[in-house]
């Protein structure tokens, strides 16, 4: 069996998203990492196929109905700047 995990990064900050993608690709080279700028882009894809979701704090606040049932798969990215909008 050749399982290839898929990881979603949902982050409006392109630089943050690309940096995290680069780190994850080095740590988990067998994984497929996909980036989305907003929640709607994720929903247009196949949202339930991901092994993990890396999301901004703002996206978690706005769409916690989706992420709360998937809390074991969800990693919230937080910084001092993220807290300004909450």
Segments (PLM) and residue ranges:
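A short, hydrophobic beta-strand element within the central beta-sheet of small alpha/beta folds
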Residues: 54-55, 71-82
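Conserved acidic segment of CheY-like receiver
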Residues: 5-14, 20
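A short, well-structured beta->alpha microelement
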Residues: 26-65
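N-terminal/domain-start segments enriched in small and hydrophobic, helix-friendly residues
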Residues: 1-9, 42-45
């Amino acid at each position: 069996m050749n399982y290839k995990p898929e990881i979603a990064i949902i982050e409006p900050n392109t630089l943050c998203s690309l940096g995290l993608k680069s780190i994850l690709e080095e740590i988990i080279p067998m994984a497929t990492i996909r980036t989305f700028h907003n929640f709607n882009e994720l929903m247009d894809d196949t949202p339930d196929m991901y092994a993990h979701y890396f999301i901004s704090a703002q996206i978690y606040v706005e769409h916690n109905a989706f992420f709360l049932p998937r809390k074991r798969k969800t990693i919230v990215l937080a910084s001092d700047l993220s807290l300004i909008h909450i």
